[in-house]
Amino acid sequence: VRTIASTEARYNPMSYHNGSIWPHDNALIASGFSRYGYRKEAAKIFEGLFAAATYVDLMRLPELFCGFPRRRAQGPTFYPVACSPQAWSAAAPLSLIQSSLGIGFDVAAAEISLCEPALPRFLDELRLYGLRVGDASVDIAFDRMGDKVVVKPLDRTGSARVVTIA
């Protein structure tokens, strides 16, 4: 998602703030989608950033990309003076996982909730190890079955509960 739509008068794909693509901002957008129940839309943003990352050295996301339209079989246009890697961009994939899977934590209830989890198209399975809530820890498997995601707790220490909301 660009900082400004390509249809806006001030759009400039090489502008720092007027048409560029920021991984950090996209993770925040995905988080907002997830908060309002749009897990598949959050996963779609994840797909776009993953695709961009495949063209970056060691898949380390930079501060931003130029906002030129996507071109088949080509990576994004790198912003000439972007920090790469960039710390807040490095955190974006973790936030995107949380947003796509609808992960929530209730420490008082020792509960990890997974609300309508979705996997991006590039992932058919995902394993998260050592998710902590209070003093408890849980390993969880996520597997795509058609258009659904099956959630299976693998290992648990302590009294944490895993609740899936379909």
Task: Show which residues each predicted segment covers.
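Catalytic cores of secreted or luminal carbohydrate-active enzymes
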Residues: 79-129
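Well-ordered alpha-helical segments within folded domains of soluble proteins
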Residues: 19-35, 83-98
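Hydrophobic/aromatic-lined pockets within catalytic cores
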Residues: 34-38, 50, 54, 97, ...
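Beta-rich accessory regions
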Residues: 33-44, 115-166
